[in-house]
A protein has these predicted regions:
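Short, flexible, solvent-exposed loop/turn segments with mixed acidic/basic and small polar residues
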Residues: 122, 173-176, 235-242
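Short, mixed charged/polar active-site loops
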Residues: 131-134, 171-174, 181-183, 229-231
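A short-motif feature that recognizes glycine-rich, charge-decorated loops
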Residues: 283-311
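Carboxylate/His-rich catalytic cores and anion/metal-binding grooves
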Residues: 1-6, 158-160, 172-220
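Extracellular/luminal Protease-associated
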Residues: 217-219, 223-279
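A short, polar/proline- and glycine-enriched secondary-structure boundary/capping micro-motif
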Residues: 146-148, 172-174, 195-198, 296-297, ...
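N-terminal, positively charged nucleic-acid-binding surface of large information/translation enzymes
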Residues: 1-171, 252-257, 262-290, 312, ...
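Short, basic/low-complexity N-terminal boundary segments at the transition from targeting/disordered tails
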Residues: 136, 186-202, 309-324
Length: 393
């Protein structure tokens, strides 16, 4: 029996909550003991049912992952890999549940429609003397403070567009963020959509723009705090399209797989990625401005658990104050949710252990070679099991 895992923890959390005790109120040793007791209860129930069905097995001495002997052998094997040099420390973005404070596998995620804010944001271009701004859009405003780059495609044509007239505040019922004279760099195919969103009533295309020639950009919050006063490089990326958005992709390598891949494939180090979100899904970094410290991305408790937290509204407000918000709106997206808590998940870069399959170990052979040899030396019933394992390895 596999007696470990989040499903067990989740059930035990429910039991504690029924007694008005949150997970944070329960000491770790008490929580683990409760999980062990819960798992053992169901092992005993299932073993009794198997016996009633006439199934033979070592019911009095079963293999349990939660046996201390089993846990010790796992730790021993982990240490052997570390001593053999096949263990590597790294980081990459994974699906993370702020409610459960844990990583989730794809199998633990379900997708639901939900309404989210969408914003169009301007990045300064120091290399241009005309004051032009490059525009991105995102449905995750909370990731803007973690922005470290902007991605573009070498297959997309881009241009400089000058705003001539904008709908008035009287017409709109609110002051527009765009203004006559604004110069914006956009994908040609998407310019009309972006300028419509910005309530621009007339514009003209001025010239072609090659993003690769622009150099670094200025973070849209740079004027507000030194934390954001870093260069924002432009990276060529295969994931950038002109199907939607602006033709440019705001790149926060800590919070997206494509973002991460674009960052490291450009020769930059994973260790330079900015990690500003804590395990409970709130901003946490010693150098972040005070206005952002502790703001939650998703509410993790109470009746509004799973709803939007304070991070998105505050980031949008700061962008408006900086003069770099071009437009905003609401859209519906299909988003990942935890199948247990039913709350949205985020993508978050976390430190992880990686085991090399091809680095030679103590016997001079790689883990892949040793595993394939062990599979070959094992008799399988049915034999098809060998093929399945071999293909996986």
């Amino acid at each position: 029996w596999d007696g470990h895992g989040l499903p067990i923890e989740w059930k035990v959390e429910e039991e504690f909550r029924s007694k008005n005790r949150g997970k944070d109120d329960v000491p770790g040793d008490e929580f683990r003991a409760a999980c062990r007791a819960f798992a053992q209860k169901w092992v005993d129930v299932q073993a009794k049912e198997f016996r009633a069905l006439g199934i033979e097995g070592e019911w009095d001495n079963p293999y349990l992952t939660m046996k201390f002997e089993s846990e010790a052998s796992i730790v021993g094997e982990f240490l052997r890999m570390a001593m053999g040099g096949t263990l590597v420390r790294g980081a990459k973005p994974i699906m993370w549940s702020p409610v459960e404070r844990t990583a989730l596998a794809e199998a633990e995620v379900e997708y639901h429609d939900r309404k989210v804010p969408v914003i169009w944001v301007k990045f300064g271009v120091p290399s241009r003397e005309d004051g032009a701004k490059l525009v991105i859009w995102t449905t995750t405003p909370w990731t803007i403070p973690a922005n470290q780059a902007v991605s573009f495609s070498t297959d997309i044509s881009y241009g400089l567009f000058e705003v001539e007239t904008v709908m008035s505040e009287e017409e709109l019922g609110f002051p527009p963020y765009a203004a006559a004279g604004d110069k914006l760099i956009l994908a040609d195919k998407l310019a009309q959509d972006v300028l419509d969103a910005a309530k621009v009533s007339a514009f003209k295309r001025v010239e072609d723009v090659d993003p690769a020639s622009l150099g670094s950009l200025v973070h849209p919050l740079a004027k507000l705090d030194p934390f954001f006063q870093h260069d924002v490089p432009l990276l060529a990326g295969d994931h950038v399209t002109d199907d939607a958005g602006t033709g440019f992709v705001h790149t926060a390598p800590a919070h997206g797989e494509d973002d991460f891949n674009a960052w490291v494939s450009s020769g930059r180090r994973a260790s330079d990625i900015r990690d500003i979100v804590s395990p409970d899904g709130a901003y946490q970094h010693r150098d972040l401005p005070q206005a952002l410290q502790g703001l939650d991305i998703i509410r993790t408790s109470g009746k509004k658990r799973g709803e939007q937290g304070k991070a998105n509204p505050e980031v949008i407000k700061l962008l408006a104050e900086s003069g770099n918000l071009l437009a905003r709106g609401i859209t519906t997206i299909r988003d990942a949710h935890s199948w247990r808590s039913k709350a949205p998940v985020i993508r978050r870069a976390t430190p992880q252990w990686f085991i090399s399959m091809d680095k030679p170990g103590p016997n001079g052979k790689s883990l892949r070679e040793n595993a394939l040899k062990a599979i070959e030396d094992t008799e399988f019933f049915p034999a098809v099991g060998r093929n399945r394992l071999q293909s996986m390895v």
